[in-house]
Regions:
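Oxyanion-binding and handling regions
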Residues: 2-31, 38, 42-46, 99-203
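Short, conserved beta-strand segments within well-ordered enzyme catalytic domains
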Residues: 24, 36, 67-69
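Conserved active-site region of classical short-chain dehydrogenase/reductase
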Residues: 45-48, 84
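Generic structural marker for isolated residues within well-ordered, non-membrane alpha-helices
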Residues: 51, 87, 104
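Phosphate/pyrophosphate-binding loops at sites that engage ATP/ADP/AMP, CoA/4′-phosphopantetheine
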Residues: 51-67, 151
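Phosphate-handling active-site elements
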Residues: 58-63, 91-101
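DPxDG-like acidic metal-binding loop motif
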Residues: 67-97
Length: 203
């Protein structure tokens, strides 16, 4: 436990494997270290190394952590489950506080204004959410690219998420007492759920 001026502060480990594989350590609201592996297919091989590298670079051991936050998707099943499982296991083993972040919210948090966020859902589809002044008003959903229309006055943000984004969003959300207790995976697809053919995004 990190103590500053006699007051307890968080040592938070953020983990995300929704696109690449990454881990980051925050002391309070300060980013201390990060480790990123961009390989979109090497999640299982890289997750342990990412966590280890981030902890070593921060000069701490896992036992000193107070919180773990995991990106919970939406993302394809194979990669997403790796980071989530690692985070849940670590938090349960060490009895740490565990938080979950929807990754489109994390991406939107790093932007300003009215935005539409999309990420690659594979199978020729997109994960989608719409935000007005930082508040999510639509999504998350799976959509077809041809169904994506960006309303006037909105910016389209299309990129993957990482552990730093997840951590920054979680810290800001927890400071406002936002409930991040949902740590269930968001796949938005299963064998018996068909994605929508298109999503007309209107203003």
């Amino acid at each position: 436990l990190w103590v500053r001026g006699g007051k307890e502060s968080t040592l938070l480990l953020a983990i995300d494997s929704s696109s690449g594989t990454s881990a980051a350590v925050f002391r309070g609201s300060e980013l201390v270290s990060r480790a990123d592996f961009e390989d979109p297919f090497g999640h299982a091989e890289n997750i342990g190394q990412a966590i280890s590298d981030a902890l070593v670079a921060a000069g701490i051991t896992a036992s000193e952590l107070t919180d773990v936050v995991i990106g919970r998707g939406p993302a394809p099943y194979t990669g997403l489950r790796v980071g989530m499982a690692a985070g849940v296991s670590l938090a349960r083993t060490l009895k740490l506080r565990l938080h979950g972040v929807m990754v489109l919210d994390a991406i939107a948090h790093s932007e300003t204004g009215n935005i539409v966020v999309t990420t690659d859902a594979k199978r020729g589809e997109l994960f989608f959410a719409k935000y007005v002044s930082g508040e999510r008003v639509e999504g998350p959903e799976v959509i077809a690219p041809e169904g994506l229309l960006i309303p006037e006055g909105f910016t389209h943000v299309s990129r993957g998420c990482d552990a730093v984004m997840v951590g920054e969003y979680a810290i800001a959300a927890l400071a406002k007492a936002t409930d991040l207790s949902d740590v269930s995976a968001l796949y938005l697809r299963s064998a018996d759920v068909s994605p929508s053919k298109g999503k007309r995004v209107t203003g």
